Structures are given as structure tokens and as C-alpha cells.
Amino acid sequence: MDLPGPIHDFLLVFLGSGLILGSIGVVLFPNPIYSAFSLGLVLVCISLFYILSNSYFVAAAQLLIYVGAINVLILFAVMFLNGSEYSNDFPLWTLGDGITSQVCISLFISLISTILDTSWYGIIWTTRSNQIIEQDLISNSQQIGIHLSTDFFLPFELISIILLVALIGAIVIARQ
């Protein structure tokens, strides 16, 4: 959107605060239904960020896929679970929690080391040369398709693996 500077800045601050409050709500609400609604708020704020940055296709995809499908699926799954499963009978820290936290910490450290070791200067020059090629393309949809099949192939596949693991986890939880 082409908005005047103060209005654009106000919307950025408003959406950022909504994003932060929604994220805190996802983590801190004791009721999982409220957490799922907070996740919906976070996803809507992210799609509005895309609208502010003139990425209308990505914003529409964000709303349709994440808010319209995945968040509703999460709400249904939470509502079908028995309420007694959320009691305070569980121990605070188990062996599985320790292993999971170690895996998450090691992934975080490897991500930070990869970010610090990457030569960002070379990536900027590669991006500038790709922009010349992209000017000949007809539409934004073609540009998105080319980026998904070339530059973002690995993240796209990793997201599909993460969604597959989440689906398998949901099936395991539903069988118990």
C-alpha cells in the first residue's frame, strides 16, 4: 500500500503490538482454545504485514491457508480433546522435555552459527542479477513459482516435512 509515512508507521506499530500480544497469548493462556484464537490473531497480523508490504498474493495465501484451514484444524483438534488431559497432574519436567530442549537448543545454535557464517554480500549481488531476469516475466504468480522452485526449494520442502510431522503427531494423539 502506498500510505503516507505516519500512517504506515502507525499501522506497523499497531500490527507489531498485535503480533507480540498474540504470541504472548499463545504461550501464556492456560486454556488451549484461547491459545488457538491467539494464534489466529498472530496469523492475521502477519497477513496484514504482507498487505502493507504490497505482497497481496502472499497475504491472501496466508489468510486462506493458515487462518482459514490450519488454525481451524487446530481449533477442532483442541475442542475434540478431553478437557481432563489439561489437568495439573503432570510432572513439571520429564526426560522427554530435557531431550526436546537439548535438540531445540542445538538447532538454534546451528541456525545462529549458519547465519553468522553466511556471506551476505554475495547473496545481495546474486539477488540483483536475478532481478534483471525477473523483469521480463509477465506476472507476480510466475515470479512466485520460479522462486519456490529455485531459490526457496529447500525451505518449501522443509515446511512440507514439518507439516507431515505435525499430521503424524495429530494422528498419534487422536489414537490415544
UniProtKB/Swiss-Prot annotation:
Q: Which organism is it from?
A: Ipomoea purpurea
Catalytic activities: a plastoquinone + NADH + (n+1) H(+)(in) = a plastoquinol + NAD(+) + n H(+)(out); a plastoquinone + NADPH + (n+1) H(+)(in) = a plastoquinol + NADP(+) + n H(+)(out)
What Pfam family does this protein match (any one)? Answer: Oxidored_q3
Stated EC number for the protein is 7.1.1.-
Gene name in the database record: ndhG
Q: Describe its membrane topology.
A: Multi-pass membrane protein
Q: What does this protein do?
A: NDH shuttles electrons from NAD(P)H:plastoquinone, via FMN and iron-sulfur (Fe-S) centers, to quinones in the photosynthetic chain and possibly in a chloroplast respiratory chain. The immediate electron acceptor for the enzyme in this species is believed to be plastoquinone. Couples the redox reaction to proton translocation, and thus conserves the redox energy in a proton gradient.
Q: What is its main location?
A: plastid
GO CC terms: chloroplast thylakoid membrane
Subunit structure of this entry? NDH is composed of at least 16 different subunits, 5 of which are encoded in the nucleus.
Protein's UniProt name: NAD(P)H-quinone oxidoreductase subunit 6, chloroplastic
Q: Mind listing the GO molecular function terms for this protein?
A: NADH dehydrogenase (ubiquinone) activity; quinone binding
Quote the Gene3D superfamilies the UniProt record gives. Answer: NADH-ubiquinone/plastoquinone oxidoreductase chain 6, subunit NuoJ
Q: Which UniProt keywords apply?
A: Chloroplast, Membrane, NAD, NADP, Plastid, Plastoquinone, Quinone, Thylakoid, Translocase, Transmembrane, Transmembrane helix, Transport
Its family remark reads:
Belongs to the complex I subunit 6 family.
Tell me where in or outside the cell this protein is found.
Plastid, Chloroplast thylakoid membrane
Positions of transmembrane segments: 10-30, 32-52, 61-81, 105-125, 153-173
